[in-house]
Amino acid sequence: MYRPEKISIRKVPMQREDLIQSMFAPPDAPPVRWRIAPSLVDYPEAVETMEREAAAIADGTADELVWLVEHPPLYTAGTSANAADLVMPDLLPVFATGRGGEYTYHGPGQRVVYVMLDLKRRRQDVRGFVAALESVIIATLDSMNVKGERREDRVGVWVRRPEKPPLMDGSMAEDKIAAIGIRLRKWVSFHGLSLNVDPDLEHFGGIVPCGIRGYGVTSLVDLGLPVMMADVDIRLREAFERVFGPTRTENE
């Protein structure tokens, strides 16, 4: 009797870019509220607002929200933060936060995008959601002729720096231009992403950003693009709508 030969199939882990499927809400869902803070927002106020908005979205009493802010100079420590990565603990205020990830810097000139979406309506896929946020950043950068890239071993968006000395292993230098850190409660996201437009890059020296050693941090202005925050906001919104669907303006 013929017995088919058993074939061993090696499972290859899916890459984050393979997880990008539709993150659109159902067709009858209202547009996502798009809100831009007109001035610097203190971090505790931002957390309180996110908590309140996320709870209302989960309860069905508020529409989804994307909130764009800038913060005064500060560090935040995610749930995986290692105290050794806070290199200069007295340089700036430090806030513990419930988002994933490690230490990061926020300050003027950095666009922080707090994303409060109901993934029950969209897709209950955390890795896919992170990949979608990366796609928003990559598309935003691409609209300004900057090539942003994802790395499987490093969440966030990176740019190659051929003009810099190579890394210790001989590979090309890379700098981080955008970070991502999220939290979910009842499948509603909060926290989000940050894109370096023109922050004080020296402030990143007080931490090991995101716990990743050996890599630098850059910004759009550092790359030679003297862009205005308002222009970046327009491009972010266009990229967001291509990935997540329509938005509507909400004034503060």
Swiss-Prot record:
Family to which the UniProt record says this protein belongs: Belongs to the LipB family.
Which residues does the record give as substrate binding sites? Answer: R99, G100, G101, E102, Y103, T104, Y105, H106, A179, I180, G181, G192, L193, S194
The chain positions of domain BPL/LPL catalytic read 60-248
Site keyed Lowers pKa of active site Cys: positions? K176
Question: Carries keyword Acyltransferase?
Answer: yes
Q: This chain belongs to which protein, by name?
A: Octanoyltransferase
Gene Ontology terms, MF aspect: lipoyl(octanoyl) transferase activity
Native organism: Rhizobium meliloti (strain 1021) (Ensifer meliloti)
